[in-house]
Amino acid sequence: MAKTYADLLQETKGQIKQVSLEDLNTRIQAGEKITLVDVREKDEWRQGYIPDAVHLPRGFLEMQAGSKLPDKNAKLVVYCAGGVRSAFAAKALQDLGYTDVESANPGYGQWKDKGFPITSPFAFTDEQLDRYSRHLLLPEVGEKGQQKL
């Protein structure tokens, strides 16, 4: 019999380590060396993220993990909005050979609601994104270059 989504999620969560948001915040505040990996999409990232997190959207994880996360023995904590994508991402990273991976549960939404530290990148308005769309596509300019202008 084929697995359901719920079966797959339960199986995945049984194969990974999970960390509560309170424990994660305590560890970060204590100065533990942790690489945070935010697997949310770009539009979610623009709304804010945990300071110093590496942005690696779930859809690009397997493709870009090697370049964005070169140390396979680093302590990684993966998070998303609610704890589902991060669970699947943590399992994928384990399958790719990363040795110390945890999934934050539940996720960024609760992290923010609890008042834990967040940061927000500069964000273009929809009007600016439309107006400067050609500039943003140019690798020589991109979002960072356009922000300077």
Name each model feature, range by range.
Residues 1-35, 42-75, 81-147:
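Rhodanese-like catalytic fold shared by cysteine-dependent sulfurtransferases
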